Amino acid sequence: MNPRRKKRLTLAVALIGGVAAIASLLLYALNSNLNLFFTPTEIVQGKKDTGVMPEIGQRIRVGGMVTIGSMVRDPDSLHVEFAVHDAAGGEIIVTYDDLLPDLFREGQGIVAQGVLSAPGKLEATEVLAKHDENYMPPEVAEAMGQSHEKLDYSEDQSKAGGYK
């Protein structure tokens, strides 16, 4: 092999190797930032179509309704724990260590993002509450088949949520 051909071959191999390295780094970065959306039932039983269940330590988003009577606050910190359920009957526990949104209350639709710490338990890093009584996040509405109904709240529940 003459020197000119050898130089071209070395350049081509280096170029292909560089493109492969960049592509693999790009795919790794995209995969680590990917947040999959699940309903509580899908977390417990797996997705209907594929049976895929999230793994412990996986970063996910979950949407559903906050179960009435499930919220437990730590009086000495911002730590709060509550259950989220969907129309199919699945329920998971969500823990959160920050201020909850102003519109957050039991019986409302939410989307929580965080890491699955145990089967059926999510350590949330972000909690989003719906905007008004008619709004439901698109992912939640689609996953629940838009089967949610407006809930009637007692006087005590309305006061606890900050509403009059």
Swiss-Prot record:
Gene3D superfamilies: Nucleic acid-binding proteins. The chain crosses the membrane at residues 9-29. Its main location: membrane. Residues 1-8 are cytoplasmic. It comes from the Bacteria. Signal peptide: none annotated. Heme binds at residues 131, 135. Residues 147-158 have a biased composition (Basic and acidic residues). The keyword Flavoprotein does not apply. The keyword Membrane applies. Keywords: Cell inner membrane, Cell membrane, Cytochrome c-type biogenesis, Heme, Iron, Membrane, Metal-binding, Signal-anchor, Transmembrane, Transmembrane helix. Residues 140-164 are annotated as: Disordered. It holds the Pfam family CcmE. GO terms for biological process: cytochrome complex assembly. One of its GO terms (molecular function) is metal ion binding. Residues 30-164 are periplasmic. It is a single-pass type II membrane protein. Heme chaperone required for the biogenesis of c-type cytochromes. Transiently binds heme delivered by CcmC and transfers the heme to apo-cytochromes in a process facilitated by CcmF and CcmH. PANTHER family: CYTOCHROME C-TYPE BIOGENESIS PROTEIN CCME HOMOLOG, MITOCHONDRIAL. HAMAP family: CcmE. Belongs to the CcmE/CycJ family. This is Cytochrome c-type biogenesis protein CcmE. It comes from Shewanella piezotolerans (strain WP3 / JCM 13877).
